[in-house]
C-alpha cells in the first residue's frame, strides 16, 4: 500500500501523516513535498526513519535527480518515462545504483515494463488502472497498440518483438485515442 500526496503537504503534516499511518506499514509515501525541496525531504526522512519516501515524477533529467540522489533525501526515485524517456531514466537508475536507491517509474505500460526488466534497482513496476470503474484491467494506451501487455495475477509477460515489443494498431482512429 502506498499514498501519493502530489506535493500537497508541508513538513509538519508529512510527519503527522507518517505517524498516523505507521501501523498500516505503507511501502512508501509519494511526493509529500515538492521534489526539489531537499532540506524538507531530509527533515521528514530523519523524523520518520521507518517510512520510505519517494519523489521524482516532476523531475525528468539526471541533472534534476543528481542532488536528490547525492543527498539521499528520499528512498525511492520515480521518474516518469513518458517525460524522461528510456535513455535518461536508465542514466538516472545507474546513478541511483551507486547509492542503493530504488527506481520505480511513475508510469505504467510497455515503456515502464521494459525499463523494469532492464534495471537492477527496480524491484517491481506500478500499474495504474485506467478503467473508469476499475472493475477490470485495461491497457494503459487503450487501442493504440494491438498487443499491449497487461498484468495477469500481478505479472506481465513481454514479447520478444523489436523495440518495446508493442505493435501499433493501424486501424485505430484519432478520435478513439
Regions found by a protein language model. Give the residues of each.
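Conserved hydrophobic beta-strand within the GNAT/NAT acetyltransferase core sheet
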Residues: 1-5, 31, 55
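Shared catalytic-loop signature of beta/alpha-barrel
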Residues: 19, 25-28, 36-155, 159
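Hydrophobic/aromatic residues in well-formed alpha-helices
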Residues: 14, 41, 172-173
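Extended hydrophobic packing segments that form well-structured cores
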Residues: 162-177
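Loop-centered beta-sheet repeat module
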Residues: 1-21
Amino acid at each position: 500500500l502506498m499514498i501519493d500526496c502530489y506535493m500537497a503537504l508541508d513538513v509538519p503534516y508529512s510527519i503527522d501523516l507518517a505517524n498516523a499511518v505507521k501501523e498500516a506499514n505503507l511501502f512508501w509515501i509519494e511526493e509529500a513535498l515538492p521534489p526539489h525541496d531537499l532540506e524538507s525531504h531530509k527533515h521528514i526522512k530523519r523524523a520518520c526513519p521507518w517510512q520510505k519516501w519517494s519523489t521524482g515524477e516532476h523531475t525528468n533529467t539526471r541533472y534534476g535527480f543528481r542532488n536528490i540522489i547525492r543527498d539521499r533525501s528520499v528512498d525511492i526515485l520515480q521518474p516518469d518515462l513518458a517525460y524522461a524517456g528510456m535513455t535518461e531514466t536508465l542514466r538516472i537508475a545507474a546513478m541511483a545504483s551507486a547509492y542503493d536507491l530504488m527506481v520505480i517509474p511513475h508510469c505504467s505500460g510497455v515503456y515502464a515494463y521494459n525499463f523494469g526488466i532492464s534495471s537492477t534497482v527496480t524491484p517491481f513496476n506500478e500499474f495504474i488502472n485506467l478503467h473508469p470503474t476499475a472493475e477490470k484491467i485495461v491497457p494503459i494506451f487503450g487501442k493504440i497498440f494491438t498487443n499491449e501487455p497487461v498484468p495477469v495475477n500481478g505479472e506481465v509477460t513481454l514479447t520478444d518483438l523489436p523495440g518495446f515489443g508493442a505493435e501499433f494498431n493501424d486501424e485505430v482512429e484519432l478520435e478513439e485515442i
